A protein has these predicted regions:
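Membrane-embedded alpha-helical bundles that constitute the cytochrome b-like, heme-associated redox core
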Residues: 1-229
């Protein structure tokens, strides 16, 4: 494949079914986590009555914990599929190695110049372009790892000493960061960080689908990338 994408063959099967399933599972989990996390951080006023009859915040916390498990397990599965799947499945995890290749950087700056409206047309790519790879690794992958680690550290506070979450995460994450409140704060800030990253991600995906001449959005549904008629 040339850096301009002239040697690509279409249609091409890019996103395997497990990658597509992971993508939409993570999207749904993140929506639940953002929604429930917002109310955990800014809970509604208390209501009168028996706690057993007014358990709304309890249900919200349970939904947050359940979605957190789905989020973490889906990410672990994604790492596994990066090992056994096709080359596009591991693009977002190999960015530090890709950066050692000078041609990768040439492609990176070509993509950046397109998004800055300096170049009218972007190069065609089967999977992620270089900027997307860097963003997915530096923002999504690292951000997700941070959210999982801090999330289970906070979860382990409630499950108390002796639980797997407390032993594997709480016991070292909270002392490392400083205290429980700081972990809450950084977990909260990273949630907003991932939220705005997702908004920008949606903008670029939709923009690329409109301007590139390739099927971008639909490829994450069908798995196939093709030239639009």
């Amino acid at each position: 494949m040339s850096i301009e994408g002239k040697d690509l063959k279409f249609p091409a099967y890019v996103w395997e079914a497990p990658v597509r399933l992971w993508h939409w599972t993570m999207a749904l989990a993140m929506i639940v986590l953002w929604g429930t996390g917002y109310f955990i951080g800014a809970p509604m006023p208390s209501v009168p009555g028996e706690a057993s009859e007014n358990y709304l915040m309890g249900y919200i916390r349970f939904a947050h914990f359940a979605a957190g498990y789905v989020f973490a397990l889906a990410f672990l599965f994604r790492i596994y599929w990066a090992i056994v799947g096709n080359k596009h499945a591991r693009e977002i995890f190999l960015v530090p190695l890709s950066m050692l290749d000078p041609t990768w950087w040439r492609g990176f700056f070509r993509v950046v110049s397109h998004y800055c409206f300096i170049r009218p047309k972007n190069d065609w790519h089967l999977g992620h372009n270089q900027l997307a790879m860097a963003a997915m690794f530096g923002m999504y992958v690292l951000g997700t790892v941070f959210m999982i680690v801090t999330g289970f550290a906070l979860y382990g506070e409630g499950t108390l000493m002796g639980s797997w979450a407390n032993t594997m995460f709480t016991s070292w994450v909270i002392p490392l960061i400083g205290d429980s409140q700081l972990v809450h704060t950084w977990h909260h800030l990273c949630a907003w960080y991932l939220f705005w990253f997702t908004i920008v991600h949606l903008y670029f995906v939709i923009r690329e689908d409109i301007t590139s001449g390739l099927t971008v959005v639909s490829s994450m549904i069908s798995g196939w990338r093709d030239v639009k008629n």
